[in-house]
């Protein structure tokens, strides 16, 4: 069975403010269910490992969409005990995905283990994807891009 690595934030504050943030649940849950329904095994990892902070705004008002509500109703443990990024081997996975939320801008964007992981995926020509603020977590290594060809 093919495995997908989903890298999420460990950061729970909006910058240095007291305002809570973290993973935007909808951006995780919709993709998580899609991956599982497509026959993939999903491994969740974060810089600190353990419980993943969920942005409380993603649980308010109109935001908990159908996939988020399904994820919560299942009492799914996927976000309860993320693996530490330092323990992850990119060679073990077929693809890498970063869901959003504001947290990745503070921890993943500058995390050396994250840079090692995404570089490993690029070096192996494996797919890397991101949704919304998850793109801030992809410190694209310059060396992984070929020289442009001029014709």
Predicted regions and their residues:
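Conserved, well-structured core segments that form or line functional sites
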Residues: 127-129
